[in-house]
UniProtKB/Swiss-Prot annotation:
Entry binding sites for Fe cation 2: E71
InterPro entries associated with the record: DPS_DNA-bd, DPS_DNA-bd_CS, Ferritin-like, Ferritin-like_SF, Ferritin_DPS_dom
Stored PANTHER family: GENERAL STRESS PROTEIN 20U
Keyword Flavoprotein in record: no
UniProt name for this protein: DNA protection during starvation protein
Family listed: Belongs to the Dps family.
Gene: dps
Any GO MF annotation of the entry: ferric iron binding
Species classification: Bacteria, Pseudomonadati, Bacteroidota, Bacteroidia, Bacteroidales
Tree of life domain: Bacteria
Localisation: Cytoplasm
Length: 159
């Protein structure tokens, strides 16, 4: 059986930067996922019910995105990292464990999304240059959802 890239027509040297970008994104998404779980479990205060439920929706959605990124790395001939210790070495998103109030968790989420969205835009650009429209489409889909989420969270926080 032929290798995946032979069938798709993509060139390994052209998609190598895409794989590298996706690998960094995977690390950031995994740390973000862990942070969202912590926010869900530990949120306190008057907004508990709303944010407890919202953070659960967000980490459930993010689990699917993590899987899509890891599978795309495989489709491009790479090998996705699965060790959290390695994610922490390369992730720009940092672990959080002390945030429990609505304002601090919401700020962390929007700051994190800013990092992630910048990486997704960069990956989309590199993927476009490599002729990798599938990764471009994946990143655009993520960005579309995340931009809407940022708008909704900002509207909620502006009470």
């Amino acid at each position: 059986m032929k290798k995946i890239l032979e069938v798709t027509g993509l060139k390994e040297q052209q998609v190598a930067p895409v794989v590298k970008g996706l690998s960094g994104l995977l690390a950031d998404l995994q740390v973000y996922y862990s942070n969202l779980r912590g926010f869900h479990w530990n949120i306190r205060g008057a907004e508990f019910f709303v944010l407890h439920e919202q953070y659960e929706k967000m980490y459930d959605d993010l689990a699917g995105k993590i899987d899509e990124v890891a599978e795309r790395i495989l489709q491009l001939g790479g090998k996705p990292e699965n060790r959290f210790s390695e994610y922490l070495k390369v992730a720009e998103v940092k672990e959080e464990h002390e945030l429990v109030c609505a304002a601090s968790t919401l700020k962390n989420v929007t700051d994190t999304l800013q990092i992630i969205m910048a990486k997704e835009r960069a990956i989309a650009e590199v993927a476009g240059e490599a002729g990798d429209e599938v990764t471009v489409d994946l990143m655009i889909g993520f960005l579309s959802e995340q931009e809407k989420l940022v708008w909704m969270l900002s509207a909620y926080a502006a009470k």
